[in-house]
Amino acid sequence: MQKDSLPTLSPAVPPYVMLGLTVAYTIFYCLLFVFVYVQLWLVLRYRHKRFSYQTVFLFLCLLWAALRALLFSFYFKNCVTANTLGPFCFWLLYCFPVCLQFFTLSLMNLYFAQVIFKAKSKYSPELQKYRLPLYLLFLSISLLFLLVNLTCALLVKINRANTETVVLVRVTVNDSLFVLCAVSLSLCLYRIAKMSLANIYLEAKGTSVCQVTLIGVTVVLLYSSRACYNLVVLALTKIKSINSFDYDWYNVSDQADLKSTLGDAGYVVFGVILFVWELLPTSLVVYFFRVRKPTLDRSASVIPGHMFSSRAYFFDNPRRYDSDDDLAWSIIPQNIQASFTSDSYDWSCRNNSFTAYTEAEESHLAPEELNPY
């Protein structure tokens, strides 16, 4: 009799809600994958440079969207498989996308630092010697992030005795790097907003300082807030007030390290976290580095051997910025540009006078000499 009086257990989230969320998440990531794939195809279509900041960004975002779409596709019928993956597959689907996001953040730092260096190199050429150390710095930071993430993920799956210690090390190292890169990106954006040459540099790409600042600040806030959340919540995991809200499964928001399976409510929150802290910033990066159709500007000033255009896009022209001197040709002071324009005018006048003289001489020739065939 007592058995019949016990309440019936029911899932925390109805099955149709779980299915609907899975379909929605998968569609979002698939749409982003298709959009990035089209952007990479347009790079070939418009004959842009195949290896540039733009193509590297897009390729990283393409790989990230593919891995996330593959992860959520497991939750249609293979929930158990998704929660009991092997060590490498677990790292590839759950952890490696976070590494890809850190790579994009590091690459954004490198890109905007290059903007500052190139703008300053017009008057301080000695700054170019810092290019190689800058590349090596961000490469070493990215490799450190990757190695720590991979090692800790494998240790969690292989040896669960020290899971909390391993996760603490991973979160401390990786999320600290996230915060440092976010601060560095903020400083770069602040310097760009204060530099007139950098403003011209960005406007030549077809964007504005306000747009760059808005996207950059949003990405910085999203990435840094996620990293700070991981650090704070992991430091407070022993406090009962947090566990009482049943949030202990994701005390690390990028990987469910401390719980082997995700419950129904945990799955919903996991998807929301990925949407806000991953899909949104990645979509902003893809939008910023989208491929534009190259346009011809008739207002460009032409001189023998060089062409200057106020709308020459930074990424879109395949023959621009192949060397360090290209920025100096695209961003020139007013007095130098005026002298180039006057020289171009004198050269064109002499060319026109020579053409007029030639036509006058030819007018004295006989008709059969003008058309010998």
Curated annotation (Swiss-Prot):
It comes from the Eukaryota. The keyword Heme does not apply. Residues 37-55, 106-135, 198-213, 290-373 are cytoplasmic. Disruption phenotype: Knockout zebrafish are viable and fertile and display no obvious morphological defects as adults. However deficient zebrafish have abnormal microglial with expended lysosomes. They also display increased bone resorption. GO terms for cellular component: lysosomal membrane. The keyword Membrane applies. Keywords: Autophagy, Lysosome, Membrane, Transmembrane, Transmembrane helix. Residues 1-15, 77-84, 157-176, 235-268 are lumenal. The chain crosses the membrane at residues 16-36, 56-76, 85-105, 136-156, 177-197, 214-234, 269-289. Lysosomal integral membrane protein that regulates the localization and activity of mTORC1, a signaling complex promoting cell growth in response to growth factors, energy levels, and amino acids. Interacts with Rag GTPases and increases the lysosomial localization and activity of Rag GTPases and thereby regulates mTORC1 translocation and activity in lysosome. Also acts as a negative regulator of osteoclast activity. May be involved in interleukin-4-induced M2 macrophage polarization. Also acts as a negative regulator of osteoclast activity. May be involved in interleukin-4-induced M2 macrophage polarization. This is G protein-coupled receptor 137Ba. It comes from Danio rerio. The lineage of its organism: Eukaryota, Metazoa, Chordata, Craniata, Vertebrata. The gene is gpr137ba.
